[in-house]
Regions:
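The catalytic Nudix box helix
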Residues: 46-47, 62-95
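Conserved hydrophobic "DFG−1" position in protein kinase catalytic cores
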Residues: 7, 38, 47, 111-112, ...
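A glycine-rich, hydrophobic loop/mini-helix early in the fold
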Residues: 33-64
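Nudix hydrolase/Nudix homology domain
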Residues: 57-58, 69, 96-163
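A short local loop/turn or secondary-structure capping micro-motif enriched for an aromatic residue
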Residues: 23-26, 54-57, 129
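Acidic, metal-coordinating catalytic segment for phosphate/diphosphate chemistry
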Residues: 1-35, 41
Length: 163
């Protein structure tokens, strides 16, 4: 199924048009995506390992993805979590952390404080091949070892003190 994204300008004003995922953007066009950081009662973060055939394959990241045309970022976050790790969350559980503007997209980053048992997680094997809970120090070590997607690492360093 093809995905379509709403197009925004540099000020995140909707431009009353959509683009098919994979089609080229014009200068000054942006789309919106979301990312969710799960933190359990031990303070550990849930990360997933990207499928080897994807861009940055084998590296670790937080769950997230593109916001489909007509969706809010909260709706997209709930959908992406269900699709990628099989966990049901509610919009009310999302704590907005930050809006990050990068290259040609805006990323809304959410925090969810939730204990999720390993047996509750069902990975979309086309997207992710593994998951684990890591402490912030373990995540920092993984970043130093270049095991984490670079843009994810940058956002983590920018926001880690808010957790």
């Amino acid at each position: 199924m093809e995905e379509y994204w709403d197009i925004y300008d540099a000020n995140r004003m909707f431009q009353n048009r959509t683009i098919r995922r994979g089609d080229p953007f014009q200068d000054g066009e942006y789309y919106v995506c979301c990312e969710v950081w799960f933190q359990n009662s031990k303070g550990e973060m849930l990360i997933t390992q990207r499928h080897p055939n994807k861009k940055a394959g084998g590296l670790w990241e937080f769950t997230g993805g593109g916001v489909l045309a007509g969706e809010t970022t909260a709706q997209a976050t709930v959908r992406e979590v269900k699709e990628e790790i099989g966990v049901d969350i509610k919009e009310a559980e999302l704590i907005f952390l930050y809006e990050h503007k990068q290259r040609n997209y805006f990323m809304d980053i959410y925090l969810v404080r939730k204990d999720i048992a390993p047996e509750e997680i069902v990975l979309d094997k086309n997207e992710t091949v593994d998951f684990k809970w890591v402490s912030k120090d373990e995540l920092r070590a993984m970043i130093e070892n270049q095991e984490v997607v670079r843009s994810v690492a940058e956002r983590f360093y920018m926001l880690a003190d808010k957790l």
